[in-house]
């Protein structure tokens, strides 16, 4: 009886079974874990916008801001660690990222809206107990309150897929990022030096492409110092606009004080000089936060005068938030 074909079939089955077992063993040996965390935020916010000529618009309302973060990590055979996360707000992805931790060689990652690399990672280093002084305040032309058009050291690539690299040492940390925006590349670097105990100084530089025709230079410098319960910070940001006489310079400082292990308060000011305007935009803000376990209460009062350099275009925001982390 010729059973050569049957033997070959059995050998194939044995080979496939062995291969499947090997792959399964490899997969489970290197399998990581996934977890879900998040926060539930209930807040009440009131905003008053004065556009001049007795044009005052006041809005009040309750706001629900809750998010979920799906994250996972696993160790490779070579000892490196792969991590992934995805942040969801109202069912939509607001940020996501993938990183490869190479130990002493640093971390290579790709992010979208992660604010983790390049100049964006040091865009605002001023200490605060709640929010930055420019948060949730309108601008004359409807610009976002935290991009280069209003003096903040962030680039248009924040919404694109960024390839980044971070290195952290005992004396300094280095961060770099690049992404394709409007048909060309945006790139930036940031360096932070731990000059002495409690004192950090940093510098960042990069380019911003708000449109196909524009390529602006962005630089920022900061210094922060912490001694006991007090932290102070000062930061200068410059936007060298490709269009003549359109540069933007911003000066930002702030101080925070930890009253005790639960209660902190802060105050800050930010002045933005628009070369195209005769009026400076002036923002100031007070924040207070109280934390008890996984629950926090935050009070913020921010005010902006001459929004985006437009005289008499003023607005103010007050909000009270209850944050529950889980």
Predicted feature residues:
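Outer-membrane beta-barrel proteins
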Residues: 1-326
């Amino acid at each position: 009886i010729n059973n050569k074909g049957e033997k070959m079939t059995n050998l194939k089955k044995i080979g496939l079974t062995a291969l499947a077992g090997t792959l399964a063993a490899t997969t489970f040996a290197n399998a990581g874990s996934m977890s879900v965390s998040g926060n539930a935020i209930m807040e009440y916010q009131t905003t008053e916008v004065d556009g001049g000529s007795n044009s005052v618009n006041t809005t009040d309302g309750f706001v629900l801001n809750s998010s979920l973060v799906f994250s996972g990590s696993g160790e490779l055979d070579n000892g490196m660690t792969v991590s992934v996360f995805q942040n969801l707000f109202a069912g939509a992805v607001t940020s996501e990222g993938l990183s490869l931790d190479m130990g002493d060689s640093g971390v290579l990652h790709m992010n979208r809206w992660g604010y983790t690399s390049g100049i964006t990672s040091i865009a605002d280093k001023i200490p605060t107990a709640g929010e930055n002084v420019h948060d949730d305040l309108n601008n004359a032309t409807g610009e976002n309150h935290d991009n280069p058009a209003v003096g903040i050291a962030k680039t248009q690539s924040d919404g694109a897929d960024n390839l980044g690299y971070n290195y952290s040492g005992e004396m300094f940390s280095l961060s770099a990022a690049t992404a394709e925006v409007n048909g060309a590349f945006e790139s930036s670097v940031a360096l932070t030096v731990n000059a002495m105990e409690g004192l950090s100084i940093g510098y960042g530089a990069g380019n911003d492409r708000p449109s196909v025709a524009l390529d602006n230079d962005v630089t920022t410098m900061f210094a922060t110092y912490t001694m006991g319960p007090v932290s102070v910070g000062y930061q200068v940001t410059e936007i060298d606009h490709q269009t003549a006489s359109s540069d933007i310079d911003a000066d930002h400082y702030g101080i925070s004080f930890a009253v005790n292990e639960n209660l902190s308060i802060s105050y800050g000011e930010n002045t933005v000089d628009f070369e195209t305007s005769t009026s400076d935009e002036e923002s100031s803000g007070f924040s207070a936060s109280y934390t008890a376990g996984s629950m926090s209460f935050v009070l913020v009062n921010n005010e902006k005068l001459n929004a985006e350099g437009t005289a008499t275009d003023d607005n103010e925001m007050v909000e009270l938030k209850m944050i529950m982390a889980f």
